[in-house]
Structure formats: C-alpha cells, structure tokens
C-alpha cells in the first residue's frame, strides 16, 4: 500500500471523480494475520469489494492492483465488480488460468512496463492470449517499479474506468 504506484492512484483517482479504497493485505503493515501466498489475500480483496460496494449504491467497482496485488486482484471476483486493472502483474503468484479476470466478459486491462524485471510484455501477452475481454498495453520506458512513470499509469487507469462508467 505504501509505494509510488498505489499512492499516485489513491491521490489522483478521487480528483478525477473516481472513488478509491486502499487496504493492506493480511500481515502487511498494521494488518493482523499471516501472509497467505495469494490465496487468503483473495478473500481480503473480496471483503474490500463488499465494503466499497456498500459505500455508495449502484456505483461501479473496479479492482485495481499493482505487482503482487495485481495477481490477487485478477484472481478475485465479486458480484459488484465492473472490471479489473492489473499493473505490472507478475502473472505467477497465482496460476493465470485461475484468475477470474481472464475467464470473464467484464473488461480487464493489463498495464505491462516495457522493462519489467519480472515478466516481459511478450511473456505476459502469451500467458493472457486465451483471456476474454482483456486488453494488454505496454508502458514505454517504465520498469516494474514505475519510478518517474506513475502519471501514465494514473492516466490510463482513469481513462479505462471512465470508458466503462460512461457507458452505464
């Protein structure tokens, strides 16, 4: 939760008219519990989606995750989710074929840094080729940590959500 990507999104989305809820997974920061290797963290995500959907009725909820959080985000599902955005997802911590986002007709955006140290764009494209309703976009010049590249992440996340919220 305390990194440049999540902080930039949390600071920028509300000023673009998009609400944001951020949370730590179990065992991170002041959160209780033990790390669950992704499986238990999916439950944390689903609880966060329930919370977000109860804040304001009939508002689309998008799951946005970065790095490990992206894998968890893409694996989690909830009846109120409108779609998924995975930022620098390793596509390895949870089996990609088990990720709900890849099996669903709701929209999914994968933002892959051109110079990601953990998963190349071509590897990500190959892994996600069978996914439905999924767009994969490379962010030129960025590496996995997006130092100096958070604004393109914020811009594309905002525009992707706006595309689908504007349809409803």
Question: Locations of the language-model features?
Answer:
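Acidic catalytic loop of the alpha/beta-hydrolase fold
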Residues: 114-119, 144-145
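Catalytic histidine neighborhood in serine/cysteine hydrolases
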Residues: 129-145
